């Protein structure tokens, strides 16, 4: 019984990995059909549906992976790092680095892969970015408690600016067909971004 569960879990992972790879390829800029995905995995469409009730659920599983990966690591940053600017830098670098290492998932994060899918998936990504923005806002607000001095600019504006920078770099990565990596020249870009945090 345990072997059967492991085999099923492995097949589910294989399907999700194939979907992510298809999103990374030129197929990712078009609607991905279950027929194309089944051919990529080497199974029938019926076999896909034995593991996932719908293509929406496949995308939902990838979004869960993105969310778990980012939120878990953000929480580790918040636990380990106490300096506000360092925290913000690490969170921004985490988001950009995750996108760079997972180009297919970046198409989901930017919404490009979801244009042809159900609206609820875009809603899930919106919620993820709202959670990240709330985390950034909280870090910005805690500066006054931790360091004795807050920002003169509203923390909502600053959090939105940091998130817009991340989203812009991820969109540029997708638009360039993954040529312009989000972390390229980060050590030069970060001081420009950090200078806005006043």
UniProtKB/Swiss-Prot annotation:
It comes from Enterobacter sp. (strain 638). Residues 33-52 bind DNA. Residues 117-145 form a coiled coil. Residues 10-70 form the HTH tetR-type domain. The lineage of its organism: Bacteria, Pseudomonadati, Pseudomonadota, Gammaproteobacteria, Enterobacterales. Homodimer. Interacts with FtsZ. Gene3D superfamilies: Tetracycline Repressor, domain 2. SUPFAM superfamilies: Homeodomain-like, Tetracyclin repressor-like, C-terminal domain. GO terms for molecular function: DNA-binding transcription factor activity; transcription cis-regulatory region binding. Required for nucleoid occlusion (NO) phenomenon, which prevents Z-ring formation and cell division over the nucleoid. Acts as a DNA-associated cell division inhibitor that binds simultaneously chromosomal DNA and FtsZ, and disrupts the assembly of FtsZ polymers. SlmA-DNA-binding sequences (SBS) are dispersed on non-Ter regions of the chromosome, preventing FtsZ polymerization at these regions. Its main location: cytoplasm. This is Nucleoid occlusion factor SlmA. It is found in: Cytoplasm, Nucleoid. NCBIfam families: PRK09480.1. InterPro entries: DNA-bd_HTH_TetR-type_CS, Homeodomain-like_sf, HTH-type_TetR-like_transc_reg, HTH_TetR, NO_SlmA, SlmA-like_C, Tet_transcr_reg_TetR-rel_C_sf. Belongs to the nucleoid occlusion factor SlmA family. GO terms for biological process: cell division; negative regulation of division septum assembly. It comes from the Bacteria. Keywords: Cell cycle, Cell division, Coiled coil, Cytoplasm, DNA-binding. One of its GO terms (cellular component) is bacterial nucleoid.
């Amino acid at each position: 019984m345990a072997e059967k569960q492991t085999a099923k879990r492995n097949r589910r992972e294989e399907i999700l990995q194939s979907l992510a790879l298809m999103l990374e390829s030129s197929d990712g800029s078009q609607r991905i059909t279950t027929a194309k995905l089944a051919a990529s995995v080497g199974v029938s469409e019926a076999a896909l549906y034995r593991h996932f009730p719908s293509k929406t659920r496949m995308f939902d599983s990838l979004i869960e992976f993105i969310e778990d990966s980012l939120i878990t690591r953000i929480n580790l940053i918040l636990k380990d790092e106490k300096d506000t600017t360092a925290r913000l830098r690490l969170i921004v670098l985490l988001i950009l680095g995750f996108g760079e290492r997972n180009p297919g998932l970046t198409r989901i994060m930017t919404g490009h892969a979801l244009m042809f899918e159900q609206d609820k998936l875009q809603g899930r990504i919106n919620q993820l970015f709202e959670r990240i923005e709330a985390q950034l806002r909280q870090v910005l607000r805690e500066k006054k408690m931790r360091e004795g001095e807050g920002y003169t600019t509203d923390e909502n504006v600053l959090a939105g600016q940091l998130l817009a920078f991340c989203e812009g770099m991820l969109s540029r990565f997708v638009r360039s067909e993954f040529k312009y990596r989000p972390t390229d020249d980060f050590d030069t870009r970060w001081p420009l971004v950090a200078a806005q945090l006043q």
